[in-house]
From Swiss-Prot:
Source taxon at top rank: Bacteria
GN (gene name): tlcC
Protein name (database record): ADP,ATP carrier protein 3
Annotated source species: Rickettsia bellii (strain RML369-C)
PANTHER family reported in the protein's UniProt record: ADP,ATP CARRIER PROTEIN 1, PTHR31187
Principal localisation: membrane
Entry's transmembrane regions: 23-43, 59-79, 90-110, 146-166, 183-203, 230-250, 296-316, 329-349, 364-384, 386-406, 449-469, 473-493
Length: 504
């Protein structure tokens, strides 16, 4: 009979359930995720900081629907073709390397010389006056390079994190290891968000712009572009360096660690069949015919749509208070730090919820958290005048931003700590073919379809009513929010039954 565990052994099991012999594999995987999530946090802030101050928060729905979604479809086709031609390791290098090259090109070539590439403001204003219903499309055309950067930043999340990293992890770990490894991987990886926020705050901190001094002349605009370039280039250089480190770690894991006797059973999953010959149409058909994969896709769609619906009004409020790119980056840097701290805390809690309370309870917590915090934000915005009359001279705009930030932080913390882990565990019982090609289609297309569906609803309103803003359509967004939360919870209940059967 084994002796009872001491208090410190129990604490270690809660916070760090990784065995010593597993550290050789776990540490490089965790560092790799840290680098990838560092880039995710930095890129997420940069893309919003470029498009929201220059074109308005309403433009995000158009970017997600008309640029990001088609790009995801094209990339899925490209990924399937690459995976049929090369093994997974080389596909990883090709894809990540392509992203890093673009980020360098944008920071050092496109952005500093944008005046030479973008149309004249007088032409753009004239077109908007002539065609008011298409003003958002005209604005995208006026800042096309920002739109391109937005696409690549969005795809980093869908492709490098959701598809490449997690697919690699799913090949290596079985269900039992995943319960211990995934929450802790996420906990270590989310330190990358804290580091990303710190980098953003550091490089934007000495360039804060007074809103009253925003440029009204061409010379002032060029000067502001120069200051933003000085902030952007070192940040992008660090992003590229983190990407290169992640590729080196991936190489070490494949060539040195997975060949060890300790990990030989895991490595067989990766090396046994890295190339699955399957056409694009066959891949899509495979997903459509699998009800189980369809339920996973619905989870992702619900989350993406709900986040899109809540984030738009919040980012519109942030722009009102921080109208320049540099100020916006600085705010988002501080937001990233708080997000990272919250995510790490939730990861510690989430790892124990997942191991002790199981898949079903863990999968339900994210929609419950999102519903509570989302309703708080909508109620605050809808009744902001009534709330303001109760608190006198209180800064309502700042308060709205804080409430929205709390909603964003708590809902995404539960998403990163529990939703991602439970979603990835749902793939593990599947066959290698369905797990690989099905995941590719679900993660890339499914992730963006959810956000694009929310974007379609919003953009349709903005096209039909050119004068509409997030403030004027907030009540309709609340109704959609309640319907989608209910659908999400129903889908978790149904998926749990099938997942339990497959794991038997």
């Amino acid at each position: 009979m084994l002796p009872p565990k001491t208090f410190f052994e129990k604490v270690k099991e809660i916070i760090w359930p990784i065995e010593r012999k597993e550290l050789k594999l776990f540490i490089p995987m965790a560092l790799m995720m840290l680098c990838i999530l560092f880039n995710f946090g930095a890129l997420r802030s940069i893309k919003d900081s470029l498009v929201v101050p220059s074109m308005g928060a309403e433009i995000i729905s158009f970017l997600k629907l008309w640029l990001v979604l088609p790009a995801c479809v094209i990339f899925t086709i490209l990924y399937v073709k690459l995976s049929n031609k090369f093994n997974f390791e080389y596909v990883f290098y090709i894809i990540v390397g392509s992203f890093l090259l673009f980020f360098l090109f944008f920071a050092y070539i496109i952005y500093p010389n944008q005046e030479a590439y973008h149309p004249n403001n007088e032409i753009i204003n004239s077109l908007i006056t002539s065609y008011p219903n298409f003003k958002w499309f005209i604005k995208i055309a006026s800042k096309w390079s920002y739109g391109l950067m937005y696409i690549f930043a969005e795809l980093w999340s869908a492709v490098v994190i959701n598809l490449m990293f997690w697919q690699f992890a799913n090949h290596i770990f079985d269900t039992n290891k995943a319960k211990r490894f995934y929450p802790v991987l996420g906990m270590v990886g989310n330190i990358g968000l804290i580091l990303a926020g710190s980098v953003l705050v550091f490089f934007s901190g000495n360039k804060i712009i007074d809103p009253e001094l925003l440029p009204n002349s061409f010379d002032a605009s060029v000067n502001l572009t120069s200051q933003t370039t000085e902030m952007l280039q070192p940040i992008m250089s660090i992003i590229v360096a983190a990407g290169v480190i992640s590729m080196l770690l991936f190489r070490i894991i494949n060539k040195s660690i997975l060949t060890d006797s300790i990990n030989v059973l895991d490595s067989k999953k990766v090396k046994a069949k890295t190339k699955t010959k399957l056409s694009v149409l066959e891949s899509i058909k495979l997903v459509i015919n699998s009800k189980y994969i369809g339920r996973i896709a619905l989870l992702i769609i619900c989350y993406g749509l709900l986040i899109n619906i809540v984030e738009g009004p919040w980012k519109a409020k942030v722009k009102e208070l921080y109208p320049s790119t540099i100020d916006y980056v600085h705010f988002m840097g501080r937001f990233n730090i708080l997000m990272g701290i919250s995510c790490v805390t939730f990861m510690i809690i989430g790892s124990n919820i997942l191991r002790r309370l199981g898949w079903f309870f863990s999968a339900l917590l994210t929609p419950i958290m999102l519903s509570i915090t989302g309703l708080m934000f909508f109620i605050f915005i809808i009744f902001i005048e009534e709330i303001g009359s109760c608190f006198g001279n209180f800064n309502l705009l700042y308060a709205a931003i804080i409430v929205g930030a709390i909603q964003n932080i708590l809902s995404k913390s539960s998403k990163y700590s529990l939703f991602d882990s439970t979603k990835e565990m749902a793939y593990i019982p599947l066959s290698l073919e369905l797990r690989t090609k099905g995941k590719a289609a679900v993660e890339v297309i499914g992730t963006k379809f959810g956000k694009s569906l929310g974007a379609f609803i919003q953009s349709l309103i903005f096209i039909i009513i050119p004068t509409a803003t997030f403030d004027s359509i907030i009540i309709y967004l609340l109704v959609i929010f309640i319907v989608m939360i209910s659908l999400w919870i129903w889908d978790v209940v149904k998926l749990n039954k099938e997942y339990t059967e497959l794991c038997k």
